[in-house]
């Protein structure tokens, strides 16, 4: 059974939701193993960041994500327009199952790392520049055209595996283009949650390993609560009027 902890007790409308899994070491009967703590944060209708909750998922698979999303929805999470995260096993299917009205944005940073995994080290800087050029375009149409050119260029460089990863995965990294351009840099990656995870890892390194998943979850939630009470949660993250205008334009066009 998945254990969950809520950082906030009331529901609300959160247009942008960021999700990620952080792996911590658990000492289980003298044997060490990794346990995934699933974390969700969101930007509310007023443009402020909030930590929604965390859960122990034995592994980042579809069942864990579905359970986590259903729990969040059951606690009142509503109005979700976009979910940002890495393309881990089952994530996309879980989003479609629990939040069918929401779109999915694959984190571009994780996408780049995935392409780099099949790129010779000597070519990584060049390939990074090529990939960033795709996401620097001013429209989805232009980004798609640039991506096609990059794929051809990678093939010409004899980087067939990298070319295939770009060709197969680029579309799910361009969902942000359907939202206000003023928000693009903050909704195409889940860097906002990665920074929280780095803070958690710093704290957990002191502890070392945990006797069970629940103690790991409790420490993670304690750190998340702490961060949520700082300037991180008290400073406006984005102007949501841009989203309202975009949604109005879309409904008129529809």
Predicted regions and their residues:
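Short, flexible loop/turn motifs enriched in small residues
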Residues: 30-37, 45-47
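Active-site beta-loop-alpha junctions of metal-dependent nucleic acid enzymes
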Residues: 54-76
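Acidic/histidine-rich catalytic cores and adjacent linkers
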Residues: 133-254
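Conserved beta-strand -> loop -> alpha-helix junction used to position metal-binding or nucleic-acid-contacting
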Residues: 82-89, 94-130
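Short, small-residue-biased leader/transition segments that mark boundaries at the very start
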Residues: 2-7
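Two-metal-ion RNase H-like nuclease active-site motif
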Residues: 12-29, 39-41
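Conserved nucleotide-binding/hydrolysis micro-motifs of P-loop NTPases
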Residues: 23-25, 45, 58-60, 88-90, ...
């Amino acid at each position: 059974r998945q254990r969950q902890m809520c950082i906030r007790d009331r529901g609300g409308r959160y247009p942008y939701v960021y999700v990620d899994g952080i792996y911590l070491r658990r000492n289980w009967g003298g044997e060490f193993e990794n346990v995934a703590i699933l974390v969700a944060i969101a930007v509310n209708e007023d443009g402020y960041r909030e930590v929604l909750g965390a859960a122990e998922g034995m592994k980042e698979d579809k069942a864990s994500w579905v359970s986590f999303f259903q729990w969040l929805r059951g606690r009142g999470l509503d109005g979700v327009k976009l979910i940002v995260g890495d393309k881990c096993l089952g994530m996309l299917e879980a989003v479609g199952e629990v939040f069918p009205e929401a779109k999915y944005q694959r984190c571009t940073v994780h996408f780049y790392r995935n392409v780099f995994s099949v790129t010779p080290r000597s070519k990584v800087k060049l390939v990074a520049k090529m990939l960033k050029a795709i996401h620097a375009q001013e429209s989805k149409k232009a980004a798609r055209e640039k991506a096609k050119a990059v794929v051809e260029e990678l093939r010409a460089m004899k980087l067939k595996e990298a070319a295939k990863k770009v060709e197969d995965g680029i579309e799910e990294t361009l969902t942000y283009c359907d939202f206000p351009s003023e928000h693009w840099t903050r909704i195409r990656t889940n860097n906002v949650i990665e920074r929280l995870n780095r803070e958690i890892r710093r704290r957990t390194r002191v502890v070392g390993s945990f006797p069970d998943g629940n103690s790991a979850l409790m420490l993670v939630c304690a750190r998340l609560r702490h961060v949520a009470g700082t300037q991180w949660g008290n400073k406006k993250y984005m102007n949501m009027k841009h989203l309202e205008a975009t949604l109005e334009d879309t409904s008129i066009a529809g």
